[in-house]
């Protein structure tokens, strides 16, 4: 199962703040590898082209839908989401699908 998220950061953030926040989100989310059962791969892209309308993308692969469900409430994921992502993002788009 793939779990793809696209975020836009809040408009009031400076370019320097956005760069630091994107790096922190990348470190936090990619640091979940090996901590969450069923999480096979996790990559965060923070270097979109100027033509993009999102600031960063999470690309994860899970063993199955049950693993994705467990990830959503896992304390390590919740800590990263609440501490490093949600305070700084204004939009979130999610697509989950079978591969």
Cite the ranges covered by each PLM segment.
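Short, glycine- and small/hydrophobic-rich beta-strand elements in well-ordered beta-sheets
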Residues: 30-57
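Conserved RNP beta-strands of RNA recognition motif
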Residues: 5, 58-60
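Active-site-flanking beta-strand signature of metal-NTP-handling nucleotidyl enzymes
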Residues: 1-9
